[in-house]
């Protein structure tokens, strides 16, 4: 197309040049004949030499994003990175299972023979003496805390919690028995003793262990007309209340014998 444009341009130039040429005839009359020269474009010349490379054109617009290509090949394994910081101490784990039992160790050297029979006997006797002394000391501490007495009786409040049967044995071991309030005077003295000690209740020497409802004193003598049963008592609750307690007001309740509480002992002066 460029060649065609060049040919057309050459033709236009030739025509323009022709129009500028003077006429082939001098000034003549109109009657004279005049010859006209017509210039015809020449043949197409040979292609010229290749011109110099032009300056780069302006960058074009950014084209549309192409389609996502296929995943490339996996790269080679990189070098090992630096060690990170030490993390916080984790929570303590659960205890593991016990390991297998190890093999038995070697046998030890034989021990030195000992005649221990007499030594064991002596140690046993010492243990008994210590136990007896400990019991005596507790009893003395209770006695020092205060006694109550009448013309014929001495009453001791024992601040050791025991079951009914053990309390009775403790009093008997000292030559007495659990306190037996057989009249108003004895009952009042015991109640006052209990209240002044700041205690709420104690075991006393009354029970119906042998026959339900037939209460007797700890010396096995039957109860007479005197009693200080509280309202609704005795009621043998849960069919297991065969022993008796005294409260600070002086009233009596039947209670279970297996519970533990403080107790009061009674001693005859003539037997001391």
Curated annotation (Swiss-Prot):
GO terms for cellular component: collagen trimer; extracellular space. Ca(2+) 2 binds at residues 233, 235, 241, 253-254. It is found in: Secreted. Disulfide bonds join 171-265, 243-257. Residues 150-266 form the C-type lectin domain. Residues 46-55, 67-76 have a biased composition (Basic and acidic residues). InterPro entries: C-type_lectin-like (IPR001304), C-type_lectin-like/link_sf (IPR016186), C-type_lectin_CS (IPR018378), Ca-dependent_lectin (IPR051077), Collagen (IPR008160), Collectin_CTLD (IPR033990), CTDL_fold (IPR016187). Ca(2+) 1 binds at residues 208, 212, 236, 241-242. Residues 45-104 form the Collagen-like domain. A carbohydrate binds at residues 201, 241, 245, 253-255. Lectin that plays a role in innate immunity, apoptosis and embryogenesis. Calcium-dependent lectin that binds self and non-self glycoproteins presenting high mannose oligosaccharides with at least one terminal alpha-1,2-linked mannose epitope. Primarily recognizes the terminal disaccharide of the glycan. Also recognizes a subset of fucosylated glycans and lipopolysaccharides. Plays a role in innate immunity through its ability to bind non-self sugars presented by microorganisms and to activate the complement through the recruitment of MAPS1. Homotrimer; disulfide-linked. Interacts with MASP1; probably triggers the lectin pathway of complement. Belongs to the COLEC10/COLEC11 family. This is Collectin-11. It comes from Mus musculus (Mouse). The lineage of its organism: Eukaryota, Metazoa, Chordata, Craniata, Vertebrata.
């Amino acid at each position: 197309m460029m060649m065609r444009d060049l040919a057309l341009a050459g033709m236009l130039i030739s025509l323009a040049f022709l129009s500028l040429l003077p006429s082939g005839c001098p000034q003549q009359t109109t009657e004279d004949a005049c010859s006209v020269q017509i210039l015809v474009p020449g043949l197409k010349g040979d292609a010229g030499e290749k011109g110099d490379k032009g300056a780069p054109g302006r960058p074009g617009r950014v084209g549309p994003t192409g389609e996502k290509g296929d995943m490339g090949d996996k790269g080679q394994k990189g070098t090992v990175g630096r060690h990170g910081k030490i993390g916080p101490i984790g929570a303590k784990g659960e205890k593991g299972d016990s390991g297998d039992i190890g093999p038995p160790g070697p046998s030890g050297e034989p021990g030195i023979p000992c005649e221990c029979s007499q030594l064991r006997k002596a140690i046993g006797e010492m243990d008994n003496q210590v136990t007896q002394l400990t019991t005596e000391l507790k009893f003395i501490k209770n006695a020092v805390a205060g006694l109550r007495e009448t013309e014929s009786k001495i009453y001791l409040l024992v601040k050791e919690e025991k079951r009914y049967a053990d309390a009775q044995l403790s009093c008997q071991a000292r030559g007495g028995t659990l306190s037996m309030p057989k009249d108003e005077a004895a009952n009042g003295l015991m109640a006052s003793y209990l209240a002044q000690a700041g205690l709420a209740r104690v075991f006393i020497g009354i029970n119906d262990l042998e026959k339900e409802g037939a209460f007797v004193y700890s010396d096995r003598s039957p109860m007479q007309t005197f009693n200080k049963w509280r309202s609704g008592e005795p009621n043998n609750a849960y069919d297991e209340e065969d022993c008796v307690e005294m409260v600070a007001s002086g009233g009596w309740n039947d209670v279970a014998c297996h519970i533990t509480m403080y107790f009061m002992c009674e001693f005859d002066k003539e037997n001391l």
